[in-house]
Amino acid sequence: MPSSSAADPTEILTAPYSEIERTQDERLRHMLALCARGHDYYERKWAGIDIGSIRGVADLERLPLTSKQDLMADPEAFRLRVPDLPLHERALWEVIYTTGSTADPTPVYNTTYDYHAYLFQSRRVAEISGIRETDVIANLFPLTPAPMGAFQRSVTNAYAAGATICAALPGSAHGNFDVHRPLDYAVRTVEVHSASVLWGVPSFLRRVLLRAQELKADFTSVRMCAISGEATTPEMREELRRCLRALKAAGTTVFNRYGSTELGAFAQCREEGDWHNPAPEIQYHEVVDPENGRRLPDGERGMLAVTHLDRRGTVLIRFLVGDVVSLTRAPCPHCGRTSERVVGPVVRGSDLVKVKGMLINPGALVAALAAMPALDEFQVVVRREKESDPYSMDELAVRIACREAPEKLMQEVAARALEITRVRTKVELVEAKEIYDPGRQTKAKRFVDVRK
């Protein structure tokens, strides 16, 4: 069994990277040995590979990559089942679901051991990002049909930081119990509890801040927005800061949390900075070529892969998260921490789409639209010119909602879209709720491709 952390649990974050890697090598050997004994998927996948010959993270290239599709196809096969482990390493604490391309979300199993590890990781995240035990966190994530990581993890992060937490319970109603609450209740929750940290999906946080201005709510206690759950642009984050300034908030810090159900959260030590791995003894990251599994040098962009070094529930080795990033292992110039950092921009591997024969990046158009403060809401749509005809030409459209000068704004949007995509774009004026209704949707869909 690997040794426990040093007396100072954060010491590893400032150690020379060679020391970090030695700890990772030790944890990896133990993790692989457990997988060889009781992990159905990897026992089959690694047939013919001498797992004992893999002595550290430098040898991981000899193991195949694991895709999201592999996990979605048979999530039970990724559960570690070693019956002679201590009870806390075997006992199921919780099941959290991650979204996928199928109708049903994919379960990720956490034992008591894993939950404690997440508390440990979350304490580090709080320290790096500046969340304090005196903070009051307003959980503005939606209450969803399946227990999703964002909502569930808000309270865990509060526990880890020693902070107070309250929840607004927004989201689309489902089932027989009337427990979901409207947008105005979210505003009231922040005001009544004098919340200092707003925790949620950025598109919904923006709606809360705009509604707070309309209601003249007291948000002077707010000092930070901690956002995750959907991709954001620098322009969107600046829009959140603008709203905070308009409300005379105590602070305008916007931390963009990066992570997933499978890997937990990374943390920024400063706004718009890189994302620190807060627990290098728990997980290892590499950037790879997804076609051949080859590890790419630090600084080169490729697909992010995570390897669990110390888990007991769902265990993933060389798991492709789905994001294109780069890594650096140089000491952080701002805080001096030495664990690896994810360097943006973070681009989903599936973000490039072909429209009328042109390969475009919808994210670039979304970023440009987010920088237009006159837009209350917007959505980029790729569809067929004739919905009933699957062979008709592609059409790129932008649906917008605004309150003033719609004709002029529509012309500006069309010109900006053409400049970015080189594809002529149709602009449609609609009601804001047709694009994003906080009472029915968990987050805004800024880009949709509805072609059949």
Identify the function of each model-found stretch.
Residues 1-26, 30-33, 212-215, 292-294, ...:
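AMP-binding adenylation
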Residues 1-97, 103-128, 132, 192-194, ...:
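Nucleotide 5′-phosphate-binding alpha/beta core
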Residues 2-10, 69-251, 255, 263, ...:
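Active-site phosphate/ATP/adenylate-binding loop shared across adenylate-forming ligases
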Residues 136-140, 305, 399:
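Short, well-ordered beta-strand segments
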Residues 147, 275, 389-390:
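Short glycine-biased active-site loop of nucleotidyltransferases that positions the nucleotide triphosphate
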Residues 168-170, 257, 288, 383, ...:
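Conserved beta-strand termini and adjacent loop/short-helix elements that scaffold enzyme active sites
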Residues 201, 228, 307, 328, ...:
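Conserved residues at the C-terminal ends of beta-strands
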Residues 232-331:
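Conserved AMP-binding/adenylate-forming
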